[in-house]
């Protein structure tokens, strides 16, 4: 099949173009993070073999690439729990048109495997580190793995990553007062530290009410102390990224409750079971897997995605209390 013309690039009725695919490859996670899976992963009764296989991944990524997608983030659950994770990276990275291959991980396998992931084609990595206090890290994640994760980040730099992105979910009374420690940590390290506001999902209403805190106070502190806002590239995510001449690291803020947060939306999501999600907080998933079984199904796969895109909402409407069907962030890859 010939590559889509620019006019056929994935675009919705609000003229938002989609350069970025978040592809979940598993729902399984070995951590028990308070804000995601506090009781740990609960199997649905289906075998892990029900997750997308390599051939299905190759076909769906090619369809997205043929319509303008240039960045793929491999997510979970914890994606590195897949035994074929390195093969998945290679499959995505080998797809014509894909320029950036990223993953989001809890970091527990990084120290041992980050070199082979990089060799397979991974060129961006995000690691979840919700506290620099090992005891608080344990409390939030349910796992005593802080030093293991830190060693994995160090190893990423050793094998040649120029920058590591670190995700921190902001939570009142848990980690919201750790900004000074985080700033000290990134002063001489090329880390983009990303503070993410706690988001309300179907199973987390009480947690949200107890621990949600806005990132506005952090933003005001940064601006008052000489941090400057960077200009976004087309396929960048929603983070407002700040830089400072005295710091090697950067600070990103992801604040989904901000006005116009969705105006620059550039990503679509495919779940580990092959459903298209137009929004993290959407009210349904659209079956794509039946059109991932043969190479010659690509025109139909693209047509279905294009058609569904025209139903994408202008906003997530979180401010109006609409949290959609997402029970927790692990279910469609965050």
Curated annotation (Swiss-Prot):
One of its GO terms (molecular function) is S-adenosyl-L-methionine binding. Keywords: 4Fe-4S, GTP-binding, Iron, Iron-sulfur, Lyase, Metal-binding, Molybdenum cofactor biosynthesis, Nucleotide-binding, S-adenosyl-L-methionine. Its cofactor is [4Fe-4S] cluster. The keyword Manganese does not apply. Pfam families: Fer4_12, Mob_synth_C, Radical_SAM. [4Fe-4S] cluster 1 binds at residues 29, 33, 36. Binds 2 [4Fe-4S] clusters. Binds 1 [4Fe-4S] cluster coordinated with 3 cysteines and an exchangeable S-adenosyl-L-methionine and 1 [4Fe-4S] cluster coordinated with 3 cysteines and the GTP-derived substrate. InterPro entries: Aldolase_TIM, Elp3/MiaA/NifB-like_rSAM, MoaA, MoaA_twitch, MoCo_biosynth_MoaA/MoaC, rSAM. Coiled coil: none annotated. [4Fe-4S] cluster 2 binds at residues 262, 265, 279. Belongs to the radical SAM superfamily. MoaA family. Catalyzes the cyclization of GTP to (8S)-3',8-cyclo-7,8-dihydroguanosine 5'-triphosphate. PANTHER family: GTP 3',8-CYCLASE, MOLYBDOPTERIN COFACTOR SYNTHESIS PROTEIN A. This is GTP 3',8-cyclase. It comes from Vibrio vulnificus (strain YJ016). The lineage of its organism: Bacteria, Pseudomonadati, Pseudomonadota, Gammaproteobacteria, Vibrionales. The gene is moaA.
């Amino acid at each position: 099949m010939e590559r889509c013309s620019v006019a056929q690039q994935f675009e919705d009725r609000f003229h938002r173009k989609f350069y970025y695919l978040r592809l979940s490859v598993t729902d399984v996670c070995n951590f028990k993070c308070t804000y995601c899976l506090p009781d740990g992963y609960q199997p649905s009764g289906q075998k892990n073999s029900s997750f997308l296989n390599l051939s299905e991944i190759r076909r769906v990524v090619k369809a997205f690439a043929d319509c303008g997608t240039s960045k793929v983030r491999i997510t979970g659950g914890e994606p590195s729990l897949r035994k074929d994770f390195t093969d998945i990276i290679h499959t995505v990275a080998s797809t014509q048109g894909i320029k950036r291959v990223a993953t989001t991980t809890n970091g527990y396998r990084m120290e041992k495997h980050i070199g082979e992931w990089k060799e397979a084609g991974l060129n961006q990595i995000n690691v979840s580190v919700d506290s620099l206090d090992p005891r608080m890290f344990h409390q939030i994640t349910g796992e005593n793995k802080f030093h293991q994760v830190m060693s994995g980040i160090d190893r990423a730099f050793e094998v040649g990553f120029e920058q590591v992105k670190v995700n921190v979910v902001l939570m009142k009374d848990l980690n919201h007062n750790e900004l000074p420690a985080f700033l000290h940590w990134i002063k001489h390290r090329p880390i983009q530290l990303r503070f993410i506001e706690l988001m309300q999902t179907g199973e987390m209403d009480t947690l949200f009410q107890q621990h949600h805190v806005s990132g506005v106070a952090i933003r005001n502190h940064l601006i008052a102390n000489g941090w400057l806002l960077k200009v976004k590239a087309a396929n960048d995510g929603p983070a407002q990224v700040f830089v400072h001449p005295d710091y090697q690291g950067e600070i990103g803020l992801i604040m989904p409750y901000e006005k116009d947060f969705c105006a620059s939306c550039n990503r679509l999501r495919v779940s580990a079971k092959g459903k298209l999600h137009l929004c993290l907080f959407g009210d349904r998933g659209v079956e794509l897997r039946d059109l991932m079984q043969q190479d010659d199904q690509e025109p139909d796969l693209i047509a279905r995605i294009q058609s569904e895109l025209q139903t994408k909402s202008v906003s997530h409407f979180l401010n109006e209390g609409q949290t959609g069907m997402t029970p927790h962030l692990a279910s469609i890859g965050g």
